[in-house]
Protein backbone atom coordinates (compact mmCIF):
# COMPACT_ATOMS: atom_id res chain seq x y z
CA UNK A 1 0.00 0.00 0.00
CA UNK A 2 1.03 3.66 -0.15
CA UNK A 3 2.31 5.73 2.73
CA UNK A 4 -1.12 7.38 3.04
CA UNK A 5 -1.96 6.52 6.65
CA UNK A 6 -5.52 7.75 6.67
CA UNK A 7 -7.02 8.26 3.20
CA UNK A 8 -10.50 8.40 4.74
CA UNK A 9 -9.51 11.39 6.86
CA UNK A 10 -7.98 13.11 3.83
CA UNK A 11 -11.18 12.53 1.90
CA UNK A 12 -13.27 14.07 4.67
CA UNK A 13 -10.86 16.99 4.86
CA UNK A 14 -11.19 17.58 1.11
CA UNK A 15 -14.99 17.52 1.42
CA UNK A 16 -14.82 20.09 4.21
CA UNK A 17 -12.55 22.33 2.13
CA UNK A 18 -14.94 22.06 -0.80
CA UNK A 19 -17.86 23.06 1.39
CA UNK A 20 -15.87 26.00 2.77
CA UNK A 21 -14.81 27.21 -0.69
CA UNK A 22 -18.33 26.77 -2.09
CA UNK A 23 -20.02 28.87 0.57
CA UNK A 24 -19.01 32.31 -0.84
CA UNK A 25 -20.06 31.26 -4.36
CA UNK A 26 -23.41 29.90 -3.23
CA UNK A 27 -24.44 32.73 -0.91
CA UNK A 28 -25.34 35.23 -3.67
CA UNK A 29 -27.91 32.75 -4.98
CA UNK A 30 -29.75 32.64 -1.67
CA UNK A 31 -29.38 36.26 -0.55
CA UNK A 32 -32.18 38.76 -1.36
CA UNK A 33 -30.71 42.17 -2.27
CA UNK A 34 -32.49 45.57 -2.42
CA UNK A 35 -33.09 47.17 -5.85
CA UNK A 36 -29.94 49.01 -7.02
CA UNK A 37 -30.05 52.83 -7.15
CA UNK A 38 -30.03 54.62 -10.54
CA UNK A 39 -26.59 54.52 -12.14
CA UNK A 40 -24.77 56.84 -14.49
CA UNK A 41 -23.61 55.76 -17.95
CA UNK A 42 -20.06 55.32 -16.71
CA UNK A 43 -21.27 53.22 -13.81
CA UNK A 44 -23.33 51.08 -16.20
CA UNK A 45 -20.28 50.59 -18.42
CA UNK A 46 -18.22 49.54 -15.43
CA UNK A 47 -20.95 47.16 -14.37
CA UNK A 48 -21.08 45.68 -17.89
CA UNK A 49 -17.31 45.17 -17.85
CA UNK A 50 -17.50 43.57 -14.41
CA UNK A 51 -20.28 41.26 -15.58
CA UNK A 52 -18.18 40.24 -18.57
CA UNK A 53 -15.22 39.59 -16.28
CA UNK A 54 -17.45 37.49 -14.03
CA UNK A 55 -18.59 35.25 -16.90
CA UNK A 56 -18.13 31.65 -15.65
CA UNK A 57 -15.04 29.87 -16.95
CA UNK A 58 -15.37 26.28 -18.18
CA UNK A 59 -14.04 24.97 -14.82
CA UNK A 60 -16.81 26.77 -12.95
CA UNK A 61 -19.41 24.90 -15.01
CA UNK A 62 -18.60 21.80 -12.91
CA UNK A 63 -19.84 23.48 -9.76
CA UNK A 64 -23.52 22.51 -10.23
CA UNK A 65 -22.52 18.84 -10.61
CA UNK A 66 -20.31 19.05 -7.53
CA UNK A 67 -23.10 20.81 -5.63
CA UNK A 68 -25.60 18.06 -6.44
CA UNK A 69 -23.17 15.16 -5.91
CA UNK A 70 -24.27 13.21 -2.84
CA UNK A 71 -23.47 9.80 -1.44
CA UNK A 72 -24.38 7.84 1.65
CA UNK A 73 -21.88 6.85 4.31
CA UNK A 74 -21.92 4.98 7.60
CA UNK A 75 -20.36 7.14 10.31
CA UNK A 76 -19.17 6.09 13.75
CA UNK A 77 -20.40 9.06 15.80
CA UNK A 78 -18.91 7.91 19.11
CA UNK A 79 -17.84 4.79 20.96
CA UNK A 80 -20.52 2.46 22.29
CA UNK A 81 -23.35 0.24 21.05
CA UNK A 82 -24.73 -0.56 17.62
CA UNK A 83 -26.64 2.73 17.50
CA UNK A 84 -23.36 4.68 17.38
CA UNK A 85 -22.97 3.81 13.68
CA UNK A 86 -25.34 6.05 11.73
CA UNK A 87 -26.18 6.35 8.02
CA UNK A 88 -25.55 9.90 6.81
CA UNK A 89 -25.61 11.72 3.47
CA UNK A 90 -22.43 13.50 2.38
CA UNK A 91 -22.47 16.36 -0.12
CA UNK A 92 -19.84 17.40 -2.64
CA UNK A 93 -17.75 15.37 -5.03
CA UNK A 94 -14.50 14.18 -3.40
CA UNK A 95 -11.39 15.65 -5.05
CA UNK A 96 -8.76 13.35 -6.52
CA UNK A 97 -5.07 13.79 -5.77
CA UNK A 98 -2.30 12.51 -7.96
CA UNK A 99 -2.13 8.72 -7.80
CA UNK A 100 -5.69 8.30 -6.48
CA UNK A 101 -8.84 6.76 -7.91
CA UNK A 102 -12.53 7.18 -7.10
CA UNK A 103 -14.49 3.96 -6.64
CA UNK A 104 -18.27 3.58 -6.74
CA UNK A 105 -18.71 1.00 -3.98
CA UNK A 106 -20.95 -2.03 -4.47
CA UNK A 107 -20.20 -4.17 -1.39
CA UNK A 108 -18.31 -3.76 1.90
CA UNK A 109 -16.83 -6.35 4.25
CA UNK A 110 -17.57 -6.52 7.99
CA UNK A 111 -14.69 -7.63 10.21
CA UNK A 112 -14.26 -8.37 13.91
CA UNK A 113 -11.92 -5.38 14.11
CA UNK A 114 -14.88 -3.16 13.14
CA UNK A 115 -16.74 -4.36 16.24
CA UNK A 116 -13.74 -3.55 18.42
CA UNK A 117 -13.37 -0.17 16.70
CA UNK A 118 -16.96 0.69 17.61
CA UNK A 119 -16.06 0.21 21.28
CA UNK A 120 -12.82 2.20 20.99
CA UNK A 121 -10.65 -0.94 21.21
CA UNK A 122 -9.03 -0.71 17.76
CA UNK A 123 -6.25 1.86 17.57
CA UNK A 124 -5.92 1.94 13.76
CA UNK A 125 -9.27 3.68 13.31
CA UNK A 126 -9.13 7.50 13.56
CA UNK A 127 -11.24 9.12 16.29
CA UNK A 128 -14.99 9.65 15.69
CA UNK A 129 -16.71 10.97 13.72
CA UNK A 130 -15.23 8.63 11.14
CA UNK A 131 -16.38 6.14 8.51
CA UNK A 132 -15.26 2.60 9.45
CA UNK A 133 -14.57 -0.30 7.12
CA UNK A 134 -11.31 -1.73 5.79
CA UNK A 135 -12.43 -3.41 2.57
CA UNK A 136 -14.90 -3.01 -0.26
CA UNK A 137 -15.48 -3.79 -3.92
CA UNK A 138 -16.79 -1.65 -6.73
CA UNK A 139 -16.15 0.07 -10.06
CA UNK A 140 -13.60 2.83 -10.72
CA UNK A 141 -15.48 6.03 -11.58
CA UNK A 142 -12.58 8.49 -11.92
CA UNK A 143 -8.79 8.33 -12.17
CA UNK A 144 -6.30 10.91 -10.90
CA UNK A 145 -3.07 12.05 -12.51
CA UNK A 146 -0.14 9.64 -12.74
CA UNK A 147 -2.43 6.58 -12.50
CA UNK A 148 -1.47 4.37 -15.43
CA UNK A 149 -2.55 0.86 -14.38
CA UNK A 150 -6.22 1.61 -13.63
CA UNK A 151 -8.99 3.02 -15.81
CA UNK A 152 -12.62 4.08 -15.48
CA UNK A 153 -14.85 1.01 -15.49
CA UNK A 154 -12.35 -1.37 -13.88
CA UNK A 155 -13.89 -3.71 -11.30
CA UNK A 156 -11.71 -3.65 -8.19
CA UNK A 157 -11.50 -4.79 -4.61
CA UNK A 158 -10.07 -2.29 -2.13
CA UNK A 159 -8.04 -2.73 1.06
CA UNK A 160 -7.64 0.39 3.19
CA UNK A 161 -7.06 1.40 6.79
CA UNK A 162 -10.60 2.83 7.16
CA UNK A 163 -13.39 4.69 5.37
CA UNK A 164 -14.79 1.90 3.18
CA UNK A 165 -18.40 1.80 4.46
CA UNK A 166 -19.75 4.37 2.00
CA UNK A 167 -21.05 4.59 -1.55
CA UNK A 168 -18.01 6.48 -2.90
CA UNK A 169 -14.39 6.17 -1.77
CA UNK A 170 -11.19 7.87 -2.88
CA UNK A 171 -8.02 5.85 -2.29
CA UNK A 172 -4.50 5.49 -3.62
CA UNK A 173 -4.56 3.28 -6.71
CA UNK A 174 -2.07 0.98 -4.95
CA UNK A 175 -4.85 0.12 -2.48
CA UNK A 176 -6.93 -1.40 -5.29
CA UNK A 177 -6.70 -4.84 -6.92
CA UNK A 178 -8.35 -5.91 -10.17
CA UNK A 179 -11.10 -8.49 -9.71
CA UNK A 180 -10.52 -11.84 -11.45
CA UNK A 181 -12.96 -12.94 -14.13
CA UNK A 182 -16.06 -14.51 -12.59
CA UNK A 183 -15.57 -13.08 -9.10
CA UNK A 184 -18.72 -11.48 -7.65
CA UNK A 185 -18.69 -8.15 -5.82
CA UNK A 186 -19.70 -10.02 -2.63
CA UNK A 187 -16.70 -12.34 -2.91
CA UNK A 188 -14.40 -9.42 -3.72
CA UNK A 189 -15.49 -7.55 -0.59
CA UNK A 190 -15.05 -10.71 1.50
CA UNK A 191 -11.55 -11.53 0.34
CA UNK A 192 -8.90 -8.87 1.23
CA UNK A 193 -8.75 -8.75 5.04
CA UNK A 194 -9.54 -12.40 5.83
CA UNK A 195 -7.50 -14.10 3.13
CA UNK A 196 -4.42 -11.85 3.29
CA UNK A 197 -4.41 -12.26 7.08
CA UNK A 198 -4.73 -16.05 6.88
CA UNK A 199 -2.21 -16.38 4.04
CA UNK A 200 0.52 -14.28 5.67
CA UNK A 201 0.11 -16.05 9.02
CA UNK A 202 0.20 -19.57 7.59
CA UNK A 203 2.85 -19.15 4.91
CA UNK A 204 4.96 -16.06 5.72
CA UNK A 205 5.09 -16.70 9.48
CA UNK A 206 4.05 -20.36 9.77
CA UNK A 207 5.86 -21.80 6.71
CA UNK A 208 3.11 -24.43 6.57
CA UNK A 209 4.31 -27.76 5.15
CA UNK A 210 2.74 -31.18 4.43
CA UNK A 211 1.80 -33.43 7.38
CA UNK A 212 1.65 -30.56 9.88
CA UNK A 213 -1.17 -29.72 12.31
CA UNK A 214 -2.91 -26.38 12.84
CA UNK A 215 -5.37 -25.08 15.47
CA UNK A 216 -7.84 -22.56 14.05
CA UNK A 217 -9.96 -20.72 16.63
CA UNK A 218 -13.32 -19.25 15.53
CA UNK A 219 -13.19 -21.66 12.57
CA UNK A 220 -16.61 -20.58 11.27
CA UNK A 221 -15.62 -16.91 10.99
CA UNK A 222 -14.11 -15.12 7.99
CA UNK A 223 -10.46 -15.68 8.90
CA UNK A 224 -11.23 -19.18 10.19
CA UNK A 225 -12.77 -20.33 6.91
CA UNK A 226 -9.99 -18.65 4.90
CA UNK A 227 -7.31 -20.34 7.03
CA UNK A 228 -8.99 -23.75 6.69
CA UNK A 229 -9.21 -23.44 2.90
CA UNK A 230 -5.56 -22.38 2.69
CA UNK A 231 -4.50 -25.31 4.90
CA UNK A 232 -6.16 -27.69 2.44
CA UNK A 233 -3.93 -26.37 -0.37
CA UNK A 234 -1.05 -28.20 1.37
CA UNK A 235 -1.03 -32.02 1.44
CA UNK A 236 -2.10 -33.89 4.58
CA UNK A 237 -2.50 -30.93 6.93
CA UNK A 238 -4.60 -31.73 10.02
CA UNK A 239 -6.90 -28.86 11.04
CA UNK A 240 -8.39 -28.58 14.52
CA UNK A 241 -11.18 -25.99 14.51
CA UNK A 242 -13.15 -24.53 17.43
CA UNK A 243 -16.78 -23.54 16.84
CA UNK A 244 -20.18 -24.09 18.42
CA UNK A 245 -21.72 -27.51 17.70
CA UNK A 246 -24.33 -26.13 15.28
CA UNK A 247 -21.53 -25.08 12.89
CA UNK A 248 -19.56 -28.33 12.89
CA UNK A 249 -21.15 -29.83 9.78
CA UNK A 250 -20.32 -26.76 7.67
CA UNK A 251 -16.73 -26.36 8.86
CA UNK A 252 -16.11 -30.10 8.45
CA UNK A 253 -17.28 -29.89 4.84
CA UNK A 254 -14.94 -26.90 4.44
CA UNK A 255 -11.89 -28.86 5.55
CA UNK A 256 -11.71 -28.91 9.36
CA UNK A 257 -10.46 -32.37 10.32
CA UNK A 258 -11.41 -32.23 14.00
CA UNK A 259 -14.19 -29.75 14.96
CA UNK A 260 -14.30 -28.94 18.69
CA UNK A 261 -17.25 -27.41 20.55
CA UNK A 262 -15.47 -24.85 22.72
CA UNK A 263 -18.66 -24.21 24.70
CA UNK A 264 -18.97 -27.73 26.09
CA UNK A 265 -15.46 -29.19 25.72
CA UNK A 266 -11.97 -28.22 26.81
CA UNK A 267 -10.22 -27.80 23.46
CA UNK A 268 -6.81 -28.40 25.05
CA UNK A 269 -7.88 -31.85 26.25
CA UNK A 270 -9.51 -32.64 22.89
CA UNK A 271 -6.34 -31.72 20.98
CA UNK A 272 -4.15 -33.75 23.37
CA UNK A 273 -6.34 -36.84 22.89
CA UNK A 274 -5.75 -36.79 19.13
CA UNK A 275 -2.28 -35.22 19.00
CA UNK A 276 -0.44 -35.99 22.27
CA UNK A 277 2.79 -34.36 21.08
CA UNK A 278 1.01 -31.08 20.33
CA UNK A 279 0.59 -28.84 17.30
CA UNK A 280 2.82 -27.22 14.69
CA UNK A 281 0.86 -23.96 14.36
CA UNK A 282 -1.69 -22.23 16.60
CA UNK A 283 -3.61 -19.23 15.19
CA UNK A 284 -4.80 -17.19 18.18
CA UNK A 285 -7.36 -14.37 17.73
CA UNK A 286 -8.56 -14.58 21.35
CA UNK A 287 -5.82 -13.31 23.65
CA UNK A 288 -5.73 -13.58 27.43
CA UNK A 289 -5.60 -17.06 28.96
CA UNK A 290 -6.19 -18.72 25.57
CA UNK A 291 -2.79 -17.50 24.38
CA UNK A 292 -1.17 -19.35 27.32
CA UNK A 293 -3.09 -22.50 26.38
CA UNK A 294 -2.08 -22.19 22.73
CA UNK A 295 1.60 -21.79 23.60
CA UNK A 296 1.51 -24.86 25.82
CA UNK A 297 -0.03 -26.88 22.97
CA UNK A 298 2.97 -26.31 20.69
CA UNK A 299 5.28 -29.20 19.89
CA UNK A 300 9.03 -28.52 19.43
CA UNK A 301 9.56 -26.12 16.49
CA UNK A 302 5.92 -25.07 16.81
CA UNK A 303 4.68 -21.52 16.21
CA UNK A 304 2.04 -19.49 18.04
CA UNK A 305 0.69 -16.62 15.91
CA UNK A 306 -1.34 -14.07 17.85
CA UNK A 307 -3.52 -11.76 15.78
CA UNK A 308 -6.27 -10.42 18.03
CA UNK A 309 -7.90 -10.08 21.42
CA UNK A 310 -11.51 -11.15 20.81
CA UNK A 311 -11.91 -12.04 24.49
CA UNK A 312 -12.06 -8.30 25.20
CA UNK A 313 -15.42 -8.14 23.45
CA UNK A 314 -18.30 -8.98 25.80
CA UNK A 315 -21.58 -7.26 24.92
CA UNK A 316 -22.30 -4.46 22.46
CA UNK A 317 -20.68 -1.83 24.72
CA UNK A 318 -17.20 -1.82 26.17
CA UNK A 319 -17.00 -4.19 29.13
CA UNK A 320 -14.22 -2.87 31.35
CA UNK A 321 -14.09 -6.11 33.32
CA UNK A 322 -13.58 -8.19 30.14
CA UNK A 323 -10.94 -5.74 28.89
CA UNK A 324 -9.11 -5.71 32.23
CA UNK A 325 -9.30 -9.49 32.60
CA UNK A 326 -7.95 -10.12 29.10
CA UNK A 327 -5.22 -7.53 29.58
CA UNK A 328 -4.24 -8.95 32.97
CA UNK A 329 -4.09 -12.49 31.57
CA UNK A 330 -2.16 -11.40 28.49
CA UNK A 331 0.61 -13.83 27.61
CA UNK A 332 4.27 -13.01 28.13
CA UNK A 333 7.22 -15.35 27.76
CA UNK A 334 10.93 -15.23 28.63
CA UNK A 335 13.38 -15.79 25.78
CA UNK A 336 14.98 -18.59 27.81
CA UNK A 337 11.64 -20.43 27.77
CA UNK A 338 11.51 -20.06 23.97
CA UNK A 339 15.03 -21.42 23.63
CA UNK A 340 14.46 -24.37 25.92
CA UNK A 341 11.08 -25.21 24.38
CA UNK A 342 12.23 -24.73 20.77
CA UNK A 343 9.09 -22.70 20.09
CA UNK A 344 8.37 -19.33 18.53
CA UNK A 345 5.74 -16.64 19.16
CA UNK A 346 4.68 -14.24 16.38
CA UNK A 347 2.35 -11.24 16.32
CA UNK A 348 0.32 -10.22 13.26
CA UNK A 349 -1.70 -7.03 12.65
CA UNK A 350 -2.74 -6.27 9.06
CA UNK A 351 -3.62 -2.69 10.03
CA UNK A 352 0.04 -1.90 10.65
CA UNK A 353 1.11 -3.19 7.22
CA UNK A 354 -0.81 -0.55 5.25
CA UNK A 355 2.42 0.99 3.91
CA UNK A 356 4.06 -2.37 3.08
CA UNK A 357 2.88 -2.44 -0.53
CA UNK A 358 5.20 -5.23 -1.67
CA UNK A 359 4.21 -7.62 1.15
CA UNK A 360 0.50 -7.05 0.57
CA UNK A 361 0.84 -7.38 -3.21
CA UNK A 362 2.69 -10.69 -2.90
CA UNK A 363 0.04 -12.14 -0.59
CA UNK A 364 -2.84 -10.85 -2.73
CA UNK A 365 -1.28 -12.22 -5.93
CA UNK A 366 -0.93 -15.66 -4.32
CA UNK A 367 -4.52 -15.60 -3.02
CA UNK A 368 -5.88 -14.48 -6.42
CA UNK A 369 -4.03 -17.33 -8.13
CA UNK A 370 -5.56 -19.82 -5.69
CA UNK A 371 -9.01 -18.29 -6.34
CA UNK A 372 -8.57 -18.68 -10.11
CA UNK A 373 -7.59 -22.32 -9.55
CA UNK A 374 -10.76 -22.86 -7.51
CA UNK A 375 -8.81 -23.76 -4.36
CA UNK A 376 -10.16 -20.90 -2.24
CA UNK A 377 -13.57 -19.22 -2.34
CA UNK A 378 -15.06 -16.85 0.26
CA UNK A 379 -18.16 -18.20 1.97
CA UNK A 380 -20.82 -15.49 2.25
CA UNK A 381 -22.92 -15.86 5.39
CA UNK A 382 -25.36 -13.01 4.79
CA UNK A 383 -25.77 -9.61 3.13
CA UNK A 384 -27.24 -6.53 4.82
CA UNK A 385 -28.11 -3.06 3.55
CA UNK A 386 -26.21 -0.10 5.01
CA UNK A 387 -29.44 0.74 6.86
CA UNK A 388 -29.16 -2.63 8.64
CA UNK A 389 -25.58 -2.30 9.87
CA UNK A 390 -26.70 -2.71 13.49
CA UNK A 391 -28.23 -6.11 12.71
CA UNK A 392 -25.10 -7.12 10.80
CA UNK A 393 -22.82 -6.22 13.71
CA UNK A 394 -25.11 -7.97 16.17
CA UNK A 395 -25.02 -11.17 14.10
CA UNK A 396 -21.23 -11.20 14.12
CA UNK A 397 -20.83 -10.21 17.77
CA UNK A 398 -23.21 -12.94 18.91
CA UNK A 399 -21.15 -15.42 16.84
CA UNK A 400 -24.13 -16.48 14.70
CA UNK A 401 -22.36 -16.18 11.34
CA UNK A 402 -20.73 -18.96 9.33
CA UNK A 403 -18.50 -17.10 6.91
CA UNK A 404 -18.41 -13.47 5.85
CA UNK A 405 -21.04 -10.83 6.58
CA UNK A 406 -21.38 -8.30 3.74
CA UNK A 407 -22.88 -4.80 3.58
CA UNK A 408 -24.42 -3.75 0.27
CA UNK A 409 -24.66 -0.09 -0.79
CA UNK A 410 -27.83 -0.80 -2.77
CA UNK A 411 -30.59 1.23 -1.07
CA UNK A 412 -33.42 -0.68 0.54
CA UNK A 413 -36.63 -0.87 -1.47
CA UNK A 414 -39.76 0.68 -0.02
CA UNK A 415 -41.27 -2.74 0.67
CA UNK A 416 -38.07 -3.77 2.46
CA UNK A 417 -38.13 -0.57 4.49
CA UNK A 418 -41.72 -1.24 5.49
CA UNK A 419 -40.83 -4.82 6.35
CA UNK A 420 -37.82 -3.60 8.34
CA UNK A 421 -39.97 -1.04 10.15
CA UNK A 422 -42.48 -3.79 10.90
CA UNK A 423 -39.69 -5.98 12.29
CA UNK A 424 -38.44 -3.07 14.39
CA UNK A 425 -41.92 -2.58 15.79
CA UNK A 426 -42.18 -6.30 16.51
CA UNK A 427 -38.80 -6.16 18.23
CA UNK A 428 -39.97 -3.20 20.30
CA UNK A 429 -43.19 -5.05 21.16
CA UNK A 430 -41.20 -8.16 22.05
CA UNK A 431 -38.88 -6.03 24.17
CA UNK A 432 -41.85 -4.46 25.93
CA UNK A 433 -43.29 -7.92 26.54
CA UNK A 434 -39.93 -9.17 27.80
CA UNK A 435 -39.58 -6.11 30.02
CA UNK A 436 -43.12 -6.63 31.31
CA UNK A 437 -42.36 -10.30 32.00
CA UNK A 438 -39.20 -9.29 33.82
CA UNK A 439 -41.11 -6.67 35.82
CA UNK A 440 -43.89 -9.14 36.60
CA UNK A 441 -41.32 -11.72 37.63
CA UNK A 442 -39.57 -9.17 39.83
CA UNK A 443 -42.90 -8.27 41.43
CA UNK A 444 -43.76 -11.94 41.84
CA UNK A 445 -40.33 -12.68 43.29
CA UNK A 446 -40.73 -9.70 45.59
CA UNK A 447 -44.11 -10.98 46.77
CA UNK A 448 -42.64 -14.42 47.33
CA UNK A 449 -39.73 -12.90 49.25
CA UNK A 450 -42.15 -10.85 51.35
CA UNK A 451 -44.33 -13.93 51.90
CA UNK A 452 -41.25 -15.90 52.96
CA UNK A 453 -40.27 -13.10 55.31
CA UNK A 454 -43.78 -13.14 56.77
CA UNK A 455 -43.59 -16.92 57.13
CA UNK A 456 -40.24 -16.57 58.87
CA UNK A 457 -41.72 -13.91 61.15
CA UNK A 458 -44.67 -16.19 61.94
CA UNK A 459 -42.31 -19.09 62.56
CA UNK A 460 -40.19 -16.87 64.76
CA UNK A 461 -43.27 -15.77 66.69
CA UNK A 462 -44.33 -19.41 67.09
CA UNK A 463 -40.83 -20.31 68.26
CA UNK A 464 -40.89 -17.43 70.73
CA UNK A 465 -44.38 -18.47 71.88
CA UNK A 466 -43.13 -22.03 72.37
CA UNK A 467 -40.17 -20.71 74.33
CA UNK A 468 -42.51 -18.59 76.45
CA UNK A 469 -44.78 -21.59 77.03
CA UNK A 470 -41.75 -23.67 77.95
CA UNK A 471 -40.55 -21.02 80.37
CA UNK A 472 -44.04 -20.82 81.88
CA UNK A 473 -44.08 -24.60 82.31
CA UNK A 474 -40.63 -24.49 83.89
CA UNK A 475 -41.79 -21.80 86.32
CA UNK A 476 -44.82 -23.88 87.25
CA UNK A 477 -42.55 -26.84 87.88
CA UNK A 478 -40.30 -24.69 90.08
CA UNK A 479 -43.30 -23.40 92.04
CA UNK A 480 -44.54 -26.95 92.57
CA UNK A 481 -41.10 -28.02 93.78
CA UNK A 482 -40.97 -25.11 96.23
CA UNK A 483 -44.45 -25.92 97.55
CA UNK A 484 -43.43 -29.53 98.09
Curated annotation (Swiss-Prot):
Disulfide links within the chain: none
Highest taxon listed in the record's lineage: Eukaryota
UniProt key word Transmembrane helix: no
Xref: CDD domains: MDR3
EC number: 1.-.-.-
Record has Oxidoreductase as a keyword: yes
Record's keyword terms, sorted: Oxidoreductase
Protein name: Synaptic vesicle membrane protein VAT-1 homolog
Record organism: Danio rerio (Zebrafish)
Organism phylogeny: Eukaryota, Metazoa, Chordata, Craniata, Vertebrata
Gene this protein is translated from: vat1
Amino acid sequence: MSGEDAPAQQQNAEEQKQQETKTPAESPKTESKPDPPPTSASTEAAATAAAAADTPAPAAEKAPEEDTFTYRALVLTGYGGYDKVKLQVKKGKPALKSGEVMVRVKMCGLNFADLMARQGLYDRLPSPPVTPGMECSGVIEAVGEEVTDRKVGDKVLVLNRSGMWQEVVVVASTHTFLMPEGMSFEEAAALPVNYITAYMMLFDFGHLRPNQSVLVHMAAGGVGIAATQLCKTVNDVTVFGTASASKHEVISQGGVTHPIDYRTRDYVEEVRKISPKGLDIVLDPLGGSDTHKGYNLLKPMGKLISYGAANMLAGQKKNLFAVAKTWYQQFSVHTLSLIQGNRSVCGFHLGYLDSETELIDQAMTAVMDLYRQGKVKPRIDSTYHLEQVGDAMRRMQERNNIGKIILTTEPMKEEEKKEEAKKDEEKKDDKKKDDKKKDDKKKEDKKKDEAKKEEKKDEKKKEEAKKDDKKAEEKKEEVKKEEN
